[in-house]
A protein has these predicted regions:
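Donor nucleotide-sugar binding/catalytic pocket of nucleotide-sugar-dependent glycosyltransferases
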Residues: 71-85, 90-107
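Short hydrophobic beta-strand element within catalytic cores of glycosyltransferases
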Residues: 224-227, 234
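N-terminal pre-catalytic "stem/leader" segment of glycosyltransferase-like enzymes
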Residues: 1-38
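Nucleotide-activated donor-binding/catalytic signature segment of Leloir-type glycosyltransferases, i.e.
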Residues: 160-186
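Acidic donor-binding loop of glycosyltransferase active sites
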Residues: 196-210, 223
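Conserved donor-binding/catalytic core segment of Leloir-type glycosyltransferases
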Residues: 111-128, 133-136, 146-147
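A charged, aromatic-enriched C-terminal amphipathic alpha-helix characteristic of glycosyltransferases
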Residues: 4-9, 248, 252, 269-305, ...
């Protein structure tokens, strides 16, 4: 299969929600400069979703003369823009932030006291699965279980074949834990369809996210989120999750995550958290729906096209 990570999924949504007559006038390259050739007859855009510290970006961004190759730079978060501005002095007057979006806003699950507490984790395995599995080993309540969809398959067959062996010990550890169900890769459509089967999305990240599509999918579905404040997570998730403070001491972070899970499980049935989750869904529907993102993109693209071809 071809890659279908957040970058590919957001590009699919862009083409679904933004008129073709606008997109035909621009050339959008995602994240890695040069992946798509520059077209002198179009507005050339680098849609940057990768982090500033990725080795394959240094050659381009470290050479300020090369910044002129693109007409515009679009970043998926203010956090990401600020990092590129700070480390590479990118052209500020040709940079825009348009965050990722979602179109999945299902009727959320209402948790009732005594129901099983179901957790979901559907991030790639190098982003914090080790910490989460350590946290699950501390949880003794048999009513709390975790389903893990973590896999390298999301980035395609070639990526999986080259990298998956590194993470097989983690998969095996997950399979052996009594309160963890290791499921592995499922298409994004499956994840979205089943998101409301879950009560919490738990993500103790050890990877600097520039956004976090997995968290957005959970938040928009009314799922309670437990995460940390590493990278752009606090921007994507705003004030809605339970935050565990990031630390390089993974043992401490696992312990704090386990405590947060147990505490959250104890209040999921309370009226205050039900109201909280209702408001959470409203927030993400208002600010992160693809109806809104399409408006942002169309406004930007019209201006960029007019500037280049009508000047």
């Amino acid at each position: 299969m071809d890659p279908r990570g957040a970058t590919e999924l957001q590009m699919e949504m862009l083409h679904k929600h933004v008129p073709k007559e606008l997109l035909d006038k621009v050339q959008i390259c995602t994240s890695v400069p040069g992946k798509v050739p520059i077209d002198p007859n179009k507005v050339n855009i680098l849609w940057q979703k990768n982090s500033y510290d990725q080795p394959n970006l240094l050659e381009f961004f470290g050479n300020k003369e090369r910044h002129k190759e693109y007409d515009w730079y679009i970043f998926n978060s203010h956090w990401n823009y600020e990092k590129f501005r700070y480390f590479f002095n990118i052209p500020e007057d040709r940079s825009v932030v348009i965050k990722n979006g979602t179109s999945n806003f299902p009727k959320r699950k209402i948790y009732k006291k005594g129901d099983p507490v179901k957790l979901i984790h559907h991030c790639t395995p190098w982003r914090g699965l080790n910490v989460l599995l350590a946290a699950m080993q501390e949880i003794k309540d048999p009513n709390i279980t975790l389903d893990v969809y973590s896999s390298t398959q999301v980035y395609g067959d070639a990526f999986k074949n080259a990298n998956d062996d590194e993470f097989k010990p983690l998969y095996e550890q997950a399979k052996k834990l009594p309160n963890v169900n290791y499921i592995g890769y499922k298409p994004n459509e499956y994840i979205l369809e089943h998101m409301t089967d879950y009560d919490m999305f738990v993500y103790p990240s050890v990877f600097e996210e520039t956004f976090c599509a997995s968290a957005l999918e959970a938040l928009a579905s009314g799922v309670h989120v437990i995460t940390n404040n590493f990278g752009a997570l606090y921007e994507t998730c705003a004030e809605w999750p339970v935050y565990v403070n990031y630390t390089e001491n993974h043992r401490n972070m696992a312990h704090a995550t386990a405590s947060a899970i147990v505490t959250a499980a104890s209040y999921l049935h309370e009226d205050f958290i039900q109201e909280h989750l209702d408001e959470q869904v409203k927030f993400y529907k208002r600010f992160y729906s693809w109806n809104k993102k399409a408006m942002e993109w169309q406004s930007f693209l019209k201006g960029a096209i007019d500037e280049k071809f009508k000047a």
